[in-house]
Amino acid sequence: MSTTGQVIRCKAAILWKPGAPFSIEEVEVAPPKAKEVRIKVVATGLCGTEMKVLGSKHLDLLYPTILGHEGAGIVESIGEGVSTVKPGDKVITLFLPQCGECTSCLNSEGNFCIQFKQSKTQLMSDGTSRFTCKGKSIYHFGNTSTFCEYTVIKEISVAKIDAVAPLEKVCLISCGFSTGFGAAINTAKVTPGSTCAVFGLGGVGLSVVMGCKAAGAARIIGVDVNKEKFKKAQELGATECLNPQDLKKPIQEVLFDMTDAGIDFCFEAIGNLDVLAAALASCNESYGVCVVVGVLPASVQLKISGQLFFSGRSLKGSVFGGWKSRQHIPKLVADYMAEKLNLDPLITHTLNLDKINEAVELMKTGKW
């Protein structure tokens, strides 16, 4: 029976308040309005961004909310005026929209679409939510809210992909893989024969490693306090790995000793201010580039010695790996289907939505 135009009742993982665990609830998902798409979410990743939300009571979020932004699914229905997807299409959800009209979208080097700011309201463009639970309106998150069996997203935050793509794998292209891989390829523009250091070997960091390898880096040094991550990092391209806790000197001094002149390209893939300072200090003093890939706390100010900038070092931000979301994501999926990209090592566990709190615990212990 068709559900077009009807309210859909389904399961969602709701955060009712800061610091609380996810609660699996039945929610009502309203039909899409103009320029909106309702999607059956088939697969979604648990990203470090959600972990930061769960671990902080100080983020400027509205509750209750449905998190999740790393998703893939099938279009269930479309609102008036939608022209780029149709019911039955396989799609990837995009926390970073591409409106195609703003200054960033029209600039060949830009990808930070102005419509991203809409996500901060945690509502749709008309100022309302498409989710309700127990008679209460539930806030959206990150333009996507994929921790729900069905979600409603603006058309500019949806990318149609290959009809035979495995959604349980390509959902990672929705954020983690693209963010890390693109940070190396697009943001840093890693050069052949260069030396790279990746601080943090989670899913995003491993994707950075793959990006550095694809760009032709001669030496890729992985840095993490969890030695269990080293084997996979080396399988994906890291030439060596270091645990700062095992070193007698600060990591930046060790990296200078190992390379004689410092690192060409450093990547902070954790979202830790102290690690960022160490990564920047590890860069070659004449031309080293440090890219901030991890999400840093918005409420904390950077404290980096000004002496580090009495040099040719560069510190760069990166959002979604520099990709223009709707334009480039289908191409990345096509590359995966052509076996040019490897997502499989990034998948450690597959759980049902009602096991989401178990997934959180696995990630906290470094097993996810």
UniProtKB/Swiss-Prot annotation:
Q: For binding NAD(+), which residues are annotated in this chain's numbering?
A: 200-205, 224, 229, 293-295
- Show the SUPFAM superfamilies listed in the entry: GroES-like (SSF50129), NAD(P)-binding Rossmann-fold domains (SSF51735)
Q: Which GO terms describe its molecular function?
A: alcohol dehydrogenase (NAD+) activity; all-trans-retinol dehydrogenase (NAD+) activity; zinc ion binding
Tissue specificity, per the record, is: Stomach and liver.
Q: Name one Pfam family in it.
A: ADH_N
Q: Highest lineage ranks of the organism? A: Eukaryota, Metazoa, Chordata, Craniata, Vertebrata
Could you give the cofactor binding note from the entry?
Answer: Binds 2 Zn(2+) ions per subunit.
Q: How does activity depend on pH?
A: Optimum pH is 10.0.
Q: What does this protein do?
A: Alcohol dehydrogenase. Catalyzes the NAD-dependent oxidation of primary alcohols to the corresponding aldehydes. Oxidizes secondary alcohols to the corresponding ketones.
E.C. number: 1.1.1.1
Quaternary form? Answer: Dimer.
Reaction(s) catalyzed by this protein?
a primary alcohol + NAD(+) = an aldehyde + NADH + H(+); a secondary alcohol + NAD(+) = a ketone + NADH + H(+)
**CDD domains this protein is in?**
alcohol_DH_class_I_II_IV
Q: Which cofactor does it need?
A: Zn(2+)
User: Quick one: which residues bind Zn(2+) 1?
Assistant: 47, 69, 175
Location within or outside the cell: Cytoplasm
Task: Add the further remark from the entry.
Answer: There are 7 different ADH's isozymes in human: three belongs to class-I: alpha, beta, and gamma, one to class-II: pi, one to class-III: chi, one to class-IV: ADH7 and one to class-V: ADH6. Isoelectric point (pH(I)) is 8.6.
Task: State the name under which the record lists this protein.
Answer: Alcohol dehydrogenase 6
- The first-level EC class reads oxidoreductase
Name positions with the PTM Phosphoserine.
Answer: 23
Q: Which GO terms describe its biological process?
A: retinoic acid metabolic process; retinol metabolic process
Its family? Belongs to the zinc-containing alcohol dehydrogenase family. Class-V subfamily.
GO cellular component annotations, sorted alphabetically? cytosol; extracellular exosome
Which domain of life does this protein belong to?
Eukaryota
